[in-house]
């Protein structure tokens, strides 16, 4: 058995792109040995940068583009993509079974995951990843510089032997990451650059609540912004306040992101509070003051 991506020839031809920038194409695969009722045994999602652009699962057997790519004609032959994903599904689940057989656990509930893809910067290949995990633990990864599969789990030594049974398998894996994947990404970018390069400014909402002990907690919520990077902090009387660390930036379910910052102050502190936001979608930093009338 050969690695997942080497089972079928690449379906896309060469493409040329002259513009500069950094972009990535990443595939995420998940296989389940005993899926719960209604859940697919195998799922795949492809991402352009951080934006999902198609899903596939074993229940439907179809690769289906998501918004806005579902309205883009010519980007991909989705029937051929469905055939490719069905072939990858079969090989992926065979690998999961092989691992379970190694551990003599043919009936257990286990998860096998894969992530692979590439990045281009200024129209040149600038990075790649190809690795797998079993039950949430690193299993095996491909090092394209050696090139070789690197076992990260006892069972992975057996997988390495199969995936390196012929030298050509390793060379094709290297070629996929360095040549074929970037070519595919460049083609996709001819249809996707405007969407990936967009800037959606954040919508900002400030709320407050009384915490135990009667201190007041102010929250500055920013949402519906893209790209992901954003800076939030609280000011009072032109002084930056000590506040809890950013909780992070989270997907908003619509291709944008949300984040928030909180600060806790004693009830006697009545000076105005201002939330400062910096984001690529804003022409200048945004300052939003807490309004007592909007208290919730």
Swiss-Prot record:
One annotated Gene Ontology cellular component of this protein: external side of plasma membrane
Expression (tissue specificity): Expressed in liver, but not in a wide number of tissues, including prostate, mammary gland, kidney, intestine, lung, pancreas, ovary, uterus, thyroid, placenta, spleen, brain and heart.
Main location class: secreted
Listed SMART domains: IGc1
Any one biological process term the GO annotation gives: antigen processing and presentation of endogenous peptide antigen via MHC class Ib
PROSITE patterns noted in UniProt: IG_LIKE
Residue numbers bearing the Pyrrolidone carboxylic acid modification: 18
Top-level taxon of the source organism: Eukaryota
Keywords, alphabetical: Disulfide bond, Glycoprotein, Pyrrolidone carboxylic acid, Secreted, Signal
Disulfide bonds: 118-181, 220-275
Domain Ig-like C1-type stretches: 202-287
Leader peptide range in chain numbering: 1-17
Similarity remark: Belongs to the MHC class I family.
Subunit structure: Interacts with PIP.
Role of this protein: Stimulates lipid degradation in adipocytes and causes the extensive fat losses associated with some advanced cancers.
Designated name of the protein: Zinc-alpha-2-glycoprotein
Organism: Rattus norvegicus
Gene: Azgp1
